[in-house]
C-alpha cells in the first residue's frame, strides 16, 4: 500500500510539473504548414498545438469555431478536408479566407445578443471585413473596431481534440489571451 501511495504521489508530482511547464500564455507549436490563424496563447490545448480558426465539424461547414490545430499530411491537396483549420488573412481585402475551400470567407452573423461566425462565399459584405493589428494582435470587425474576434474561456472536448467557440466581444472587456491572434502566411 505504501509503495502504491508513493507511486501515486510521484505521478501526481510529474503531472503537476508538466502542467506548470506549459503555461496558458506560452505560444503554441502549430503542427501544420501555413497559412493558419492561431490564438497566440496556447491556453489549455493538451498537445501544445494551439487553437486555430476552423470550420465546425469535419471538412467544409457553414459555421466556424476554434479547434486544436491539426497536423499537416505530406502531399495533401489544397482542398483536402483535413485542412479545415487553415485560414489566411488578406490585408488588401480585409477578409479571413478559407485555405482549402477557396472563395469562402469568415462572416460575422450578428443578431440581438448573439453572434456566430459563418463560412460563406466571399463578398463585399461589411461583416466579412476585419482589421488585423500586428501591434496588439487583435482582429477587429472593420465596421465597428471596438469589437474583436475572441474565443470562449472554456475548452470543450471534440473527439481526440478540443475546441472553443468564436465570439465577437467588446475588445476592452476581454483578456488579451482570449483575443490575440497570430497570422502565419505561406
Q: What residues fall within each predicted segment?
A:
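C-terminal motif of bacterial Sec signal peptides marking the signal peptidase cleavage site
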Residues: 15-17
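Lectin-like carbohydrate-binding module/patch detector with strong preference for beta-trefoil
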Residues: 20-186
